[in-house]
Swiss-Prot record:
All copies of domain Tudor, residue ranges: 732-790
Cross-referenced PROSITE patterns: TNASE_2, TNASE_3, TUDOR
InterPro entries, sorted: Silence_cplx_Nase-comp_TudorSN, SNase_OB-fold_sf, Staphylococal_nuclease_OB-fold, Thermonucl_AS, Tudor, Tudor_TDRD11
Organism: Danio rerio (Zebrafish)
One matching Pfam family: SNase
Stated name of the protein: Staphylococcal nuclease domain-containing protein 1
Keyword Repeat applies: yes
GO terms assigned for molecular function: nuclease activity; RNA binding
Keyword presence, Ribonucleoprotein: no
Length: 897
């Protein structure tokens, strides 16, 4: 503390005290100050000056930590008032002083004057006159006018009973200092982020101070919210080593705040560290430190900063651009996007989980946009390993994922949003940093109506904010708002941060589950128009729906239309997509994907798919597809109330000659009439063997003529398997894959995997016999290439009875199935294809010996009803079936009882 001030303020060697100048850095007590010089390329030197001939009371002192024999000492009477009197007069101001005496220990005594010369106020005299200091009379010399004046001023103060000389001893002037706070978090919360008057008593470094809170005299250490400046590292020997610019940052804060009157907003208290913002009439020290390159923004405390985090980011950005101090080596990331690609307006077409959306640009291009700097809900810890055998569905099985997706879906689907690209996350390989491979991601801030969607999601506790390395600039342009939103969500216990039991969504996926679909079908059919959400679009007419009321997922086929089919992986190889199948699927996606719709369930096919009409905002999707020349009317629509509308829409599309009708040429009416009259019912009966009858009265049959080929193939295949048995458990079944399966009789048969519930439960379909079974994967093996479906196609073909309707009543349907099983199971019959169905060919079946029609027999026995066809060439058969139905009705047989 005895280091010299700069040369211009050095004392001369003359006998008379030389007048020196400096700036008051700190007031130690009522009779001691620290002065400093002007900075020259760094913090300036400083020295302590004690006022000559007077003594003020000693301030309170805390016991030395680690020394149990020391204890706290309180203020002496009027000591704090003397310190405050002098602090308010001289702190931060220029003073001139003389050094009259210097002790062997290096303590300097002298006179201090406010201003640039001795004409200014004598600080010692002012203190004595106010009764805040006593004169040391033992050293007074009568021939010294300044000392005599001090004595006169003291006498006047005594007679006026000022300060130390007042009655009562001054006990009321002793502060009740509080060095510790029992519960800092409660203390901070009790202030409700209101400004508190304070005096900065000590500066630890650029962003940490010790403050005296008024009027209750709490001494607290406060770290500035949102920033971190270079610090002093404590070494093993107790010394401190400053980081680059640590001393400069400390001086910057000291010169502006030390012993100044300020207001402090105490904002948070994580881990017993009090975070706050210091308000001074001349500016915000937090922003100034950033702007001058003495500090950097820190995310962990930025969230609690109450004065606008964007100001801090802007100040830091300014320092980076100017490359000042800690940013002298800063290299800005290169921008690789044009302005038009950085900001654009797009329409939201799909929400992907809870952190990404698919948008349609003005150019018609589709683009996936990930919300910047947020992470969707995910499974943590033991939940990841729970129920490994269960099919994992992230949307329903991850807590709050469904709520997050629904929030985005309801807010965004079909609406235009503003997209500001923040950064592009490069693609990662699976080997990098032990993380899964990800493609390149465009990360952006998405707003609608001025609302930041990511921030809204985080504020509801439906997503969390990603934490970055401090030097990682690839983050949201509104990162601080995201952190603040997360802090609010945590404080209010929202969503993921709630202590309540997590919501569970028990959603039954009955798509492809025939038995389950049968259970739901009566309820959906009776419900009439039901609300649904389109979860997925497989093709123009095939969708997956979520039924909120029934909490189930169903596969849905549009009724009344014939839509082009997309490419499919078939047993004989990849089936090429039909023309305009992609356009039809895109049309359906744009119109209904993830929208709320209404459906009317009419029927169900053998595979458990529901055949229905779908409406969205008053638009019938079947009609819309036909109207846009992306589908044709199917004959099954004839029985529907929408038939006329569909025919009209198709005629309109034909006239426009668009898409499916581009090559359509209208033929003369006469020719059409002749063709209609000429068409007759086909009579090509083929001998076949019925193998398996389903609950929906469909059946699987083998062509008798190819039976020998199948027998030869099976014999050869089993011989090869016997010679080279498959390794048990080596086959990993996948849905849709062909394999061989060991049936209950111990023999191997060709099969197709329909569903994998777990290794112990694999659903297979025997492609040559039409039956199904659930068995362990240990009873499955890869299908030898020599016996694939290319060598011999699947021999079991699915058919349905023509001209009949299966009863909806389960008991009646079971009776009909039993009757058919008794009559035709494993029996050779003659099969004739009458017309095409939605799922499979519709046929009549005759007994090979008697030529009796099996379906007609069911009608005669009152087991089934007649399906009335409108085609003219079928009317003879329809009439025969209707006559049989009338006979059954008259006799009140079975369903007509």
């Amino acid at each position: 503390m005895a280091s010299a001030v700069p040369a211009q303020v050095q004392s001369s060697q003359a006998s008379a005290p030389q007048l020196q100048r400096g700036i008051v850095k700190m007031v130690l007590s009522g009779c001691a100050i620290i002065v400093r010089g002007q900075p020259r390329g760094g913090p300036p030197p400083e020295r302590q000056i004690n006022l000559s001939n007077i003594r003020a009371g000693a301030l309170a002192r805390r016991a030395i930590q680690g020394q149990p024999d020391t204890k706290d000492t309180p203020d002496e009477p009027w000591a704090f008032q003397a310190r405050e009197f002098m602090r308010k007069k001289v702190i931060g101001k220029e003073v001139c002083f003389t050094v009259e005496n210097k002790t062997p220990q290096g303590r300097e005594y002298g006179m201090v004057y406010l201003g640039k010369d001795t004409s200014g106020e004598n600080i010692a005299e002012s203190l004595v006159a106010e009764g805040l200091a006593m004169v040391r009379r033992e050293g007074i010399r009568g021939n010294n006018p300044e000392q005599v004046r001090l004595c006169d001023l003291e006498d006047q103060a005594k007679s006026s009973k000022k300060g130390l000389w007042s009655e009562g001893g001054g006990s009321h002037t002793i502060r009740d200092l509080k060095y510790t706070i029992e519960n800092p978090r409660n203390f901070v919360d009790s202030l409700h982020q209101k400004p508190v008057n304070a005096i900065i008593e000590h500066v630890r470094d650029g962003c940490m101070v010790r403050a005296l809170l008024l009027p209750d005299y709490y001494l607290v250490t406060v770290m500035l919210s949102g920033i971190k400046s270079p610090t002093f590292k404590r070494e093993a020997d107790g010394s401190e080593t400053p980081e680059p610019f640590a001393a400069e940052a400390k001086f910057f804060t000291e010169s502006r705040l030390l012993q100044r009157d300020v207001q402090i907003i105490l904002e948070s208290c994580p881990n017993q560290v009090i975070l706050g913002t210091i308000l001074h009439p001349n500016g915000n020290i937090t922003e100034l430190l950033l702007k001058e390159g003495f500090a950097r923004c820190v995310d962990w405390s930025m969230a609690v900063y109450t004065q606008g985090a964007e100001k801090l980011r802007a100040a830091e950005r300014s320092a980076k651009e100017r490359k000042v101090r800690i940013w002298k080596d800063y290299v800005a990331p290169t921008a690789n996007l044009d302005q038009k690609d950085r900001q654009f307006v797009a329409k939201v077409m799909q929400v992907v989980n809870a952190d990404a959306i698919v948008v349609k640009l003005n150019s018609g291009e589709y683009k996936t946009i990930h919300l910047s700097s947020i992470r969707p809900p995910r499974l943590e810890g033991e939940e990841k390993n729970k129920d490994k055998d269960k099919r994992f569905r992230p949307l329903y099985d991850i807590p709050y994922m469904f709520e997050a997706r629904e929030f985005l879906r309801k807010k965004l689907i079909g609406k235009k949003v503003n997209v500001t690209v923040d950064y592009i996350r490069a693609a990662t390989n699976a080997m990098e940093m032990g993380v899964p491979a990800f493609p390149e991601r465009t990360c952006a801030t998405v707003t609608i109506g001025g609302i930041n969607i990511a921030e809204a999601l985080v504020s509801k506790g439906l997503a969390t904010v990603i934490r970055y390395r401090q030097d990682d600039d690839q983050r949201s342009s509104h990162y601080d708002e995201l952190l603040a939103a997360e802090a609010r969500a945590i404080k209010n216990g929202k969503g993921l941060h709630s202590k309540k039991e997590v919501p569970i969504h028990r959603v039954a996926d009955i798509s492809g589950e025939t038995q389950k679909a049968k259970q739901f079908f009566p309820f959906l059919q009776r419900a009439g128009r039901s609300e649904a959400v389109v979860e997925y679009v497989f093709s123009g007419s095939r969708l997956k729906l979520y039924m909120p009321k029934e909490t189930c997922l169903i596969t849905f086929l549009l009724a009344g239309i014939e839509c082009p089919r997309g490419s499919r992986n078939m047993p004989g190889g990849m089936q090429v997509a039909e023309p305009y199948s992609e356009e039809a699927m895109l049309f359906t996606k744009e119109l209904v994907l993830q929208r709320e719709v209404e459906v009317e369930v009419e029927s169900m096919d053998i595979a458990g798919n529901f055949i229905d009409w779908l409406h969205i905002d008053g638009v019938n999707l079947s009609v819309a597809l036909v109207e846009n020349a992306l589908s044709k009317v199917h004959f099954t629509a004839e029985r529907s109330s929408y038939y006329k509308t569909l025919v009209s829409a198709e005629e309109s599309a034909r006239q426009r000659k668009e898409k499916l009708w581009a090559n359509y040429e209208e033929k003369p009416n006469e020719e059409v009439a002749q063709v209609t009259e000429a068409k007759e019912r086909g009579r090509n009966t083929d001998p076949s063997t019925s193998l398996e009858i389903t609950d929906g009265l469909h059946f699987y049959a083998q062509d008798v003529e190819t039976g020998t080929k199948l027998e030869n193939l099976m014999e050869s295949m089993r011989g090869e398997i016997a010679a080279q048995p498959p390794v048990e458990g080596s086959f990993a079944p996948r849905r849709g894959e062909f394999c061989i399966a060991k049936f209950a009789d111990g023999e191997w048969y060709r099969a197709r995997v329909e569903k994998v519930e777990s290794p112990a439960k694999v659903h297979v379909f025997y492609i040559d016999y039409g039956n199904r079974e659930v068995l362990s994967s240990t009873r499955l093996a890869a299908l030898p290439p020599a016996f694939s479906t290319r060598t011999l196609p699947p021999q079991a073909t699915e058919y349905a009875f023509a001209y009949i309707q299966v009863p909806q009543d389960e008991d009646a349907r079971a009776d009909a199935v039993d009757s058919v099983v008794r009559d035709i199971h494993n029996t050779q019959c003659l099969l004739n294809v009458e017309y095409s169905g939605m799922v499979c060919p519709q046929v009549t079946l005759q007994f090979a010996d008697t030529k009796e029609d099996v379906g007609l027999g069911l009608v005669k026995e009152g087991m089934v009803m007649v399906d009335i066809r409108k085609e003219k060439y079928l009317q003879k058969m329809v009439t025969e079936y209707l006559n049989a139905q009338e006979s059954a009705k008259s006799a009140r047989l079975n369903i007509w009882r």
